Amino acid sequence: TKEDNLLRKFEEIHDYIYANDGLSPQQTLEEFVKILFIKIFDENENLNQFTISTEEWNELKTGKPVNSIIERIAKLFEKTKEAYQDIFDADDRIKISNIALGFTINKLQGISLLNSSQDAKGLAFQKFLSHHEKDGRGQFFTPEPVIDFCVAMMQPKPNETIIDPACGSGGFLMSALKYLQNNNDKLNTKKVVAKNLFGLDINKSIARIAKMKLLLEANGNINILCTNSLEDLDGIKLSLANSEGFDLVLANPPFGAKITNTNTLSKFD
């Protein structure tokens, strides 16, 4: 199936980077997600820059620095960072070797993530994450059955705005979206994702994963911000273009974390 084919490609890329570049499982996942953002940006803008020729790939395999591919992807990443400023910093860079980058592009260039069915690409990415998310951060993730139970208990409606102020990799938001899809035959998924689902997380690399999950479901405006939701709630509402507040809060905050910043604490006295 398309889902299995995509999942196989994702796994091959992850395993290649992990085996050849000496990165931790967490770093490998972070780099792979960066590459997916570059790929989707290239498709969205019809740039056709996310490519590697047979000649370039063969030269890379001999150990030569192939400047054409390195420069092409570097420029593409700069544009990608501009497009997704909420989850990328200007000084973010690709931290995998040229050969691993070439391998990744070679595996992905023949497929279109935007034109793949939502189910195929979404499920492939979800299965891929289920294999790798827990490698470095499993203790922070709420089990899926618990998330689904909480969402079903709240019975979200298509017109309600939902926020997770500690969204992690987007488990509650994805579960809410699935609930809405399963209970509303004519749901406009793209509109719901753009207008009704909001997520905040202080960790940029985890926020990227949440954004990628929703991008693969509905390519468009995705309201995931990397920010500390305890610090400036009014500013956050403005940046989310939602000054009215939210109908539902679905979250499992990191209760184990200790806050010592007096400015933050003063807001809750």
What are these regions (language model features)?
Residues G22, Q26, I94, L114, ...:
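Conserved phosphate/pyrophosphate-binding and hydrolysis machinery centered on Walker-type P-loop NTPases
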Residues T1-L47:
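Accessory nucleic-acid engagement/destabilization modules that flank
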Residues K34-F37, F41-S130:
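Long recognition/docking surfaces used for binding and targeting
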Residues R8, D119-A124, P145, G171:
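Generic alpha-helical secondary structure signal
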Residues F255-D269:
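Mobile active-site "lid"/loop adjacent to the S-adenosyl-L-methionine
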Residues G136-A251, G256-K258:
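Conserved S-adenosyl-L-methionine
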